[in-house]
């Protein structure tokens, strides 16, 4: 199959291929190295110009765990805003709150919602289904405490990328 790329993008792809013509398969990269690369990618996403009225870190406690979360409220948000529970991607093995900070800010601003990003426990340090259990526990807590979080209880969505 032949794909016609934009000339600027084609130049970037050609440069990347020439720099490393035989990249390793992701399964062959040690997890620590893979995680470090993922973190570096996240740092390339600037948050300049994406100013939410409120951004704070807290945690949600359940019977089984403590789930770190980050809450984003856009400027001018209504007293009780719609909510988005954001679950980051990374195959339940990589990722954290910082990697999707820019995206969560953008979602809060452009969709006029309060975003609550979850930072679940990662495998293989925590056996499956620990990450899923973290997300379920945090979601249940958020739904039960919507008023305290200034959320409209009937307008809370769940989203994310990849594993999220």
Regions from the PLM with identified roles:
Residues 40, 113, 151:
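Short glycine/serine/threonine/alanine-rich loop segments
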Residues 1-71:
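A glycine/proline-hinged amphipathic helix-loop "lid/cap" segment
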Residues 81, 88-93:
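Active-site glycine-rich loops that stabilize anionic/oxyanionic intermediates
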Residues 119-123:
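Short beta-to-alpha linker loops that shape the active-site pocket of alpha/beta-hydrolase fold enzymes
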Residues 65-67, 74-84:
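Proline/glycine-enriched tight loop/beta-turn segments at coil->beta junctions
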